[in-house]
Structures are given as C-alpha cells and as structure tokens.
C-alpha cells in the first residue's frame, strides 16, 4: 500500500473542517469565483423538503480552492454501489504497490456469483475466467456486483478495504459486507444462493418474504451505520483522488476515465450539468420497495467548459417518491450547484 503523506494531510485538513451549510474561506488563493453558498443553501433546503420523509445529503467542493458546502454533511447514508469507487481505488492501490497484477486471471465458481446487477453472473457458466483488469472495468463502468465481491475478496475483504481508507485518513466511509450478503439482507431474505442469480428468480424469492419482515429489514438498513458514507467523507475521498494522494498518476487517470465512461445513473448528476461539462462519477441505488427508496446516490468530479473542477456528492435515503423522483432531485441538486458556481 502507498505510504501516508502527513504533510498532504495537514494541507487538506483545514479545507474539510466546516460545519454543514456554513460558508468557508478558500484554502488557497484561487482564480475561480467563490461559490454562492447562501443561494445554494436556499436551493438545497427547498429540495430537502421535497425529499421528505427522506433525508438529503449534499457536498460540493471547488477542487482548486477547497471552498466547500455541506448539507447534512456528517450524516451517514447507505452507499449502495457508490462503495465500488473506494473499492476500485483500493484495488488500484494494490496494483500500484505490485501486490496484484492487472493481468492476473480469476476463475469464477458458482459460489462467487452475486445478485443483480451482475452481467458476469448472467454470463456464467458460459464464461468463467476474467482478468483483474476486466473485473475492475466491470465494477466501475457497469457496477457489476459479482466483480465487486471477487475483487473485495482479493484485497482481503470489507475489513481490509475500510482499513485502507482509514490509513488514508478517510474515516467518513466504511465498507462492511459483500454484495451477496448486503443485498438480500435489505429485503429480509436468507443468504444469497446461486439459483437467485437470475433476476426473475431473485425477485420471486424476495416477494415470498412477508411484507412486515421486508418493511422491518428496510427500516433497519436505513438506520444501519454499516456500508455508509457521509457527504463530508465522500468529498474528502474525491479531493484526495483528484490530488493524486491515493494512487499513482496512471492509476488515478485510469479510475477517472472509467468513471467517465459509465452510462449508469445518467438521469442524476449528468442530467443537471451543462451539456459541455465532463463528469466522472459512481452512482448507486437500491430498488424502490415497500413504498420507499432506501438509497439513491451519485458522487463524482465534474469539469466545466472553463476547466474549473468540482467534487460533488449527493445522497438520498428514505424518500417515498416514485422511481423517477429521486433521480430528479439529484439532477436538481446538480443544477443548483452549477448556478451557485456562477
């Protein structure tokens, strides 16, 4: 693993010591205009009302100056597939350290398959062998759950990933479970079994769980501190990624390039940005169930046409809006951010 850079930590820390919804002075001199923090706060608070009884969390940071905005910045939100971003970073960190080769071959057995979304599970047993590089691409670009679980195991499991984050002074993110554990638990289901790799079979098994059991499991999931991140924690991660504090230049470039190629979550942050903006992101969401959207998120780095770059993190948990509603709120957060940037 890469060694810790305490000087970088001391330089970054002041930019992250801010209260939710409070203005903050830029960390360094900047040629970019200040964020309209008051206007942004007004817009985000209005969207938080729309999201009720769900909770909205927002983080925005000017990556040149460090000027930041947070709403519910310390609140823990379930990540869903957003966790695949720090997972990919940790895998690339192992590649940088020479502990894993991107060309290393992995042969999948049935017990490694994970619930949807997983084109790799759907392709099994027709295809069983992948390189680490191919699995990494499947995780970041296509959000493949089987690929995520296999790579998680390869680096030592969820505990090892959280330890890697902690070693980088990133304590606002924690990963605790494999997808094959987490996803069934959300719905009060038994442990995942290979026969559920078919989406229809998985949905049928989920519907067999009593409604009261599913509702209780969903409520417990939204209150569970495991597998969560705070908006502040995610901004810290994105800032360190942008500053090359986590990975080599080559690995950082590769990760951002893969994040830029995902087509998932296109109705969220991407929908709220100008057409000429570039976005490298990792969305994540749980299925709308029991009348609630337990997790609907999108985090990333966007670069405007004038080359100003910003980190943004939007989390939404517990909204009772229909399937399109949470997407629309995240897109509106992105629009509000662009207006505030000026």
Regions found by a protein language model. Give the residues of each.
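Structured C-terminal helix/loop/strand segments within mature extracytoplasmic catalytic/sensor domains
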Residues: 2-10, 22-44, 158, 219, ...
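Short, highly charged low-complexity linear segments
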Residues: 144-153, 174-179, 194-211, 292-304, ...
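Active-site-proximal helix/loop microenvironment
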Residues: 172-248
């Amino acid at each position: 693993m890469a060694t810790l850079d305490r000087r970088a930590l001391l330089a970054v820390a002041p930019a992250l010591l801010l209260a939710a919804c409070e203005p903050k002075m830029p960390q360094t001199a900047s040629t970019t205009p200040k964020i309209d923090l008051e206007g942004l706060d007004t817009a985000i608070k209005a969207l938080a009302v729309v999201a009720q009884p769900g909770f909205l969390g927002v983080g925005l940071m000017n990556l040149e100056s460090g000027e930041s905005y947070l709403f519910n910045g310390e609140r823990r939100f379930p990540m869903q597939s957003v966790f695949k971003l720090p997972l990919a970073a940790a895998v690339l960190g192992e590649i940088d350290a020479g502990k894993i080769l991107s060309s290393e071959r992995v042969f999948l057995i049935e017990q490694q398959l994970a619930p949807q979304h997983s084109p790799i599970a759907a392709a099994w047993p027709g295809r069983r062998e992948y390189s680490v590089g191919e699995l990494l691409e499947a995780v970041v670009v296509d959000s493949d759950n089987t690929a995520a679980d296999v790579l998680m195991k390869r680096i030592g499991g969820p505990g090892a990933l959280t330890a890697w984050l902690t070693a980088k002074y990133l304590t606002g993110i924690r990963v605790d479970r494999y997808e094959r554990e987490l996803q069934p638990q959300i719905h009060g289901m038994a442990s995942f079994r290979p026969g559920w790799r078919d989406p229809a079979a998985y949905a049928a098994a989920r519907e067999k769980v009593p409604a009261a059991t599913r509702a209780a499991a969903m409520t417990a999931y939204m209150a569970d501190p495991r597998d969560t991140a705070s908006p502040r924690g995610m901004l810290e991660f994105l800032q360190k990624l942008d500053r090359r504090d986590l990975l080599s230049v080559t690995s950082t470039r590769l990760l951002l390039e893969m994040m830029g190629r995902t087509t998932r979550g296109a109705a969220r942050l991407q929908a709220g940005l100008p057409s000429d903006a570039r976005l490298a992101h990792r969305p994540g969401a749980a299925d709308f169930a029991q009348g609630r959207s337990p997790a609907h998120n999108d985090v990333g780095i966007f670069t405007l046409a004038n080359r100003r770059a910003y980190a943004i993190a939007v989390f939404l948990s517990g909204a009772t809006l229909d399937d399109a509603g949470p997407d629309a709120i995240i897109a509106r957060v992105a629009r509000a951010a662009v207006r505030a940037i000026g």
